[in-house]
Swiss-Prot record:
SUPFAM superfamilies in alphabetical order: P-loop containing nucleoside triphosphate hydrolases (SSF52540), Sec63 N-terminal domain-like (SSF158702), Winged helix' DNA-binding domain (SSF46785)
Gene name tied to this protein: hel308
Enzyme nomenclature, EC number: 5.6.2.4
Protein name as it appears in the record: ATP-dependent DNA helicase Hel308
Domain Helicase C-terminal intervals: 235-431
CDD domains: DEXHc_archSki2 (cd18028), SF2_C_Ski2 (cd18795)
GO MF annotation list: 3'-5' DNA helicase activity; ATP binding; ATP hydrolysis activity; DNA binding
Keywords: ATP-binding, DNA damage, DNA repair, DNA-binding, Helicase, Hydrolase, Isomerase, Nucleotide-binding
Domain of life: Archaea
Transmembrane regions: none
């Protein structure tokens, strides 16, 4: 037995052995072996606390295949982010080779659970599924919670805690498995879910950690080493040293702007050394990325060609994917990123550099948490490629290296603590208990509340629960009937569309001041909702935003009491949404307001969900059907980013906002207009190639014509069509 590696035990189940064979796993990592010993195959609840890259995903797969074989039912794998969901979907494809259908569920909160035995979902989506399908909890045989330490996140924590508590309270006997790389109080989390601990510090690639100051690397063991000063810029010299040794570097920095600036500087200095044919292939892919402002796509393409890239949440998914693939392939040697990458996709590097241990928000700065440092440092070391990984935290001029060593390298991550105490989280939690059942006793609410992490750590928050129930009652979402609480029709609808309960009083107040005949008013309403992702407005933008209000909705200035930072952020969000539904391009929106495509797509997705949800609850607030219809249409326009006349066309698969406008301007203004369109005519239009023409014709039920048109186009591309047609004519003449 090599250190940390174990043979698959003879007592492992057939399902585990089959999975290992298909996955190419010949020997088990230490945490994997420990999980088998702890009973992961037998349905034991577990908390697995082990470093990044130590095989936690395989443990999850073992739990899934054994649980489904043993008990049937369904398996859910929960993640905090959509990007992680898509990454896991790819790595879980092995399940299809075991006859298990896999689905991903991250979107519409109104949809029920997908029909598949294995589902990957975000926390929020699974929470909504429990509300839409109350019986689901009893049919889940295993629930895997990735990043279970997220229970201490202010935003997602209450949602995750609510999910686990309701699963513990359900009549079913689902196996619960929590996974984390940073959970120092794993024992307490295990006690919460009634499970065992699998705790290991073993890594497939050993980690070396240092503090960098004045071109010296300080080790926790007391070692000291000089870093060659080649470029006189520490990020370049630290990256270049790793590259020289056959590695790659991942540099985490505190802002998007700095990530871009450093990447450009690195490309100028290192580009000639790092450029390669493979890098140019990925560069070409980046330049063709869909949905990205041309300036951003071209900028990133030029950097990738030089073997350098940057990565942040503002990039569209297509560009983020290209950067990630180029880095994994080794075509890009250095990526400058914001810390969001550390919490998202798995992208390891030989050397990780933490450019600053501060974060900057609203003009203030504060040190990052130890858990955040550990998350970034955990990306160091590529399994199968590196003998070791290095994590380097950069000291400031007045820092003492030993303080950073004790404060970050040697320090344990912060305890995982419940965030359920806030009224907002508790209101959401309680409505999620009451609405699916229709009516419950206060004792039932206290029973589920007693199964929360908060209750374990601090006791049952009876006073806060009472205040939360009072709010829900005052807003018309529940009725208190002695010792029982019943959901109203409004409450059930709010729970079903998954809106924050506070949306109801906000909606009631805002409708007093707006006109539903004014699109900007409606978009401002959406932007004020508690769930909305708002765009912060800078001081320089405030004058332009006031002008926008005067142009779009002059009476808003008299109806809004105060335009502080939150209100200005809502105005900016409404302005950008108005541009979007008026078909402004991503380039225009980025150029005018500096909104990156990734942020725009996130905002659009949230706004569409809120608008749709408001359209559903409007009748329960006494608003007429016209209001519901207007909000429903606005929701569809936000989803597709179009003016009203294109709503029919964008429903056709493959026809987005740009192609829909092209079809409209060419005279195809409705489905009826397209019913008689010839494939050849469609393919002559800009951006309507054979594939899109085929999708249009198939949508119209003209399948044979679609296939024939695509075949003719392929022959034409190969230069065979004229030859075949000429041959056919010759044959006719011969007859």
């Amino acid at each position: 037995m090599s250190k940390g590696l174990y043979d698959i035990p003879s007592w492992a189940t057939t399902e585990t052995r089959t999975l290992a064979k298909l996955a190419g796993v010949e020997r088990l990592f230490e945490p994997q072996y420990m999980a088998l010993q702890a009973g992961v195959e037998k349905g034991e609840n577990l908390v697995v606390a082990a470093p990044t890259g130590s095989g936690k995903t395989f443990i999850a797969l073992v739990a899934i295949v054994n649980s489904l074989a043993r008990a049937g039912g369904r398996a859910f794998y929960l993640v905090p982010l959509k990007s992680v969901a898509y990454e896991k979907y790819t790595s879980f494809s092995i399940l299809s080779r075991m006859g298990l259908k896999l689905k991903i569920s991250v979107g519409d909160f109104r949809e029920g659970p997908p029909e598949a035995p294995v589902v990957i979902a975000t926390y929020e989506k699974f929470d909504s599924l429990l509300r839409v399908s109350p019986s689901l909890a009893r049919n889940v045989s295993v629930l895997i919670v990735d990043e279970i330490h997220s229970v201490s996140d202010p935003k997602r924590g209450p949602i995750l805690e609510s999910i686990v508590s309701r699963m513990l309270a359900s009549a079913g006997e689902a196996q619960l498995v929590g996974l984390s790389a940073t959970v120092p109080n794993a024992g307490e989390i295990a006690e919460w879910i009634g499970g065992k601990i699998v705790e290991s510090s073993w890594r497939p690639v050993p980690l070396r950690e240092y503090v960098f100051k004045e071109y010296k690397l300080y080790s926790p063991t007391g070692g000291l080493r000089e870093v060659p000063r080649v470029y006189g810029l520490y990020d370049l010299d630290l990256a270049a040293e790793a590259i020289e040794d056959g590695g790659q570097a991942l540099v985490f920095t505190y802002s998007r702007r700095r990530a871009v600036t450093l990447a450009k500087r690195a490309a100028k200095r290192l580009g000639r050394r790092l450029s390669s044919r493979e890098a140019r292939v990925y560069s070409a892919e980046a330049s063709r990325a869909e949905g990205a402002p041309r300036s951003v796509a071209e900028e990133l393409a030029s950097l990738i060609a030089a073997g350098i890239a940057y990565h942040h949440a503002g990039l569209p998914p297509s560009l983020r994917k290209t950067v990630e693939e180029a880095f994994r392939a080794g075509a890009v040697k250095v990526v400058y990123s914001t810390p969001t990458l550390a919490a998202g996709v798995n992208l390891p590097a030989r050397r990780v550099v933490i450019d600053s241990y501060y974060r900057y928000e609203a003009g203030f700065r504060e040190p990052i948490r130890v858990a955040e440092y550990k998350q970034m440092a955990g990306r160091a070391g590529r399994p199968g490629l590196d003998e070791f990984g290095e994590a380097i935290i950069v000291a400031e001029r007045l820092d003492r290296p030993e303080d950073l060593i004790s404060g970050y390298i040697r320090a344990p991550p912060e305890r995982v603590e419940s965030r359920l105490a806030g009224l907002r989280g508790l209101r959401h939690f309680i409505l999620g208990i009451v609405a699916p059942e229709g009516e419950v006793s206060i004792g039932s609410i206290e029973k589920v509340s007693g199964l929360t992490l908060y209750s374990l750590q601090r006791g049952l928050p009876r006073e806060t629960i009472a205040r939360a129930v009072e709010d829900l009652s005052a807003w018309g979402l529940v009725e208190v009937k002695g010792w029982r609480i019943a959901a109203t029709s409004l409450g059930r609808e709010v729970a079903a569309v998954y809106l924050d309960p506070e949306s109801v009083p906000v909606f009631r107040e805002e409708v007093k001041h707006l006109s539903f005949d004014n699109e900007f008013d409606i978009l401002y309403l959406i932007s004020t909702m508690p769930d909305m992702v708002r765009l912060p407005a800078t001081r320089r933008e405030e004058e332009r935003l006031l002008e926008a209000i005067l142009d779009a909705s002059p009476r808003m200035l008299s109806s809004v009491d105060w335009l502080g930072p939150e209100e200005m952020a809502a105005v900016k969000t409404a302005v950008v949404l108005k541009l979007w539904i008026d078909e402004a391009s991503e380039d225009t929106i980025y150029g005018e307001w500096g909104v990156h495509t990734g942020d725009l797509l996130n905002m659009v997705s949230t706004a569409e969900w809120i608008a749709s949800g408001l359209s559903r609850i409007a009748p329960y607030l006494g608003l007429n059907s016209k209001v519901s219809h207007i909000l429903s249409v606005i929701a569809r326009r936000i989803k597709h980013g179009v003016k009203p006349e294109l709503l029919q066309l964008v429903e056709i698969p493959g026809v987005g906002r740009v192609r829909a406008r092209i079809l409209f301007e060419a005279g195809y203004r409705s489905i009826e207009d397209l019913a008689t369109a010839r494939a050849e005519d469609l393919m002559r239009l800009p951006l309507i190639g054979p594939s899109t023409a085929r999708q249009i014709l198939e949508f119209l039920g003209r399948v044979d014509e679609a296939r024939e048109a695509e075949a003719r186009e392929m022959l034409a591309r190969k230069g065979l069509l004229s030859y075949l047609e000429g041959d056919a004519v010759a044959g006719e003449e011969g007859e």
